[in-house]
Amino acid sequence: MAASFVFLQKILCYILRYRKNVVLLQKNEYMKNLRIIVLSVWCIAYGTLCTAATPFPKTAADSVILDAIQKDSIIPGAVLCVVENGEISYLQAYGNRAVVPAQEAMTTNTIFDLASVSKPTGAGSAALLLCAEGKLNVNDYVAQYIPQYHSDVQIRHLMTHYSGLPAYMTATRLDSIYLARGVEMARAEFTIDTIARCKRPSAVGEKYRYSCLNFISLQKVVEAIVGEDINTYMRYKLYRPLGNSTMGWLPADSLYDRIAPTECIDDICILGDVHDPLARIMMTGVSGNAGVFATAEEVANWAIWFMNLPEETRINGCNAGLWTDSVSTSTGSFTQSCRHTGYTGTSVTILPEEKRAVILLTNRVHPKDEHNLAPLRRALNNMLTP
């Protein structure tokens, strides 16, 4: 379901971005999707007719989160941050941020490994900034920036997961490739070179396949343009101006006492290092697919920034790593929704037109990776659009 809406949003993005030059769309693709486009435009148009939204049910949210901690033991703890009318209206911590090796109470300033929520908040936002400055175009070919890359892949294919690339490459597989090439130590340049030359399961534009490799590729495009690593660029271009002093990759040692640990392997808990093996081992912690650390309030600040972008830029942004959907509101009409989840137990859902967002950060994989967070996420999302 999410994949189909991403595709719809991609088409809408083209129409809005190039409305004076619709011929850029291939005629066959346009005619094939005409009915879908009309329906999507109708949904978005009706979203603007929504009346004032019902206040977020904070007490009910507290209840479902506490049940997940105390009754169902799905998570050790969580931080919930709610944005209403473009401002943070609620920030609450629950349970514990650590239970192994010792119990530590959760605090609202706890720093989380965002996992795949790094895609929209990191590489996706970086690409969005560069597009707004005219330094990058969604129709640019990736090979313009990474010469050895597949020649038919455009930036838009990376953003919308239509590149045809595999979903993932395990650290074990990459390690074997490195050894075969005589490379003894994992280095990011060898990882991107392997991605650039890998066999693709499907042709470009043929099939939606969510892929971490797309956003590692996007990261390297960004770095080629700005001339520095994405961590440095985003810290000073976006995170610090938003007041997000701790947001970014590779958190400082001085912040470790505020970081929520993730999975414990052989009695050693991952703390301060990204949980994702591809990002941690093969990209040495700075990766487009994962690795951003932040507090719930910092993610909310990012969401507010995103909601205040011009509509056309925002729609491009929904394609820059965010799932897109049209959800029903309390009035029975529709509004655009952007959302993304992270493997460690993180999620962000944004309703840009209503200036509302819900950020739920948990360390679901602590101390063991064995619980499903989908019911809790679904319950909170339903509260966002009662």
Label the model's feature ranges:
Residues 1-55:
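Bacterial Sec-dependent N-terminal signal peptides
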Residues 55-112, 135-139, 197:
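Short, conserved catalytic-motif segment at the N-terminal edge
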Residues 65-66, 80, 86, 123, ...:
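Residue-level preference for non-acidic, small/hydrophobic
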Residues 72-79, 101-158, 202-213, 287-290, ...:
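Short active-site loop at a secondary-structure junction
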Residues 95-99, 310, 365-367:
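A short acidic/small-residue loop/turn micro-motif
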Residues 153-336:
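Short, surface-exposed loop or secondary-structure junction motifs
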Residues 311-316, 327-332, 367-386:
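Short, gly/Ser/Thr-rich active-site loops of penicillin-recognizing serine hydrolases
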Residues 337, 344-357:
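Short, surface-exposed beta-strand/loop micro-motifs that present aromatic residues
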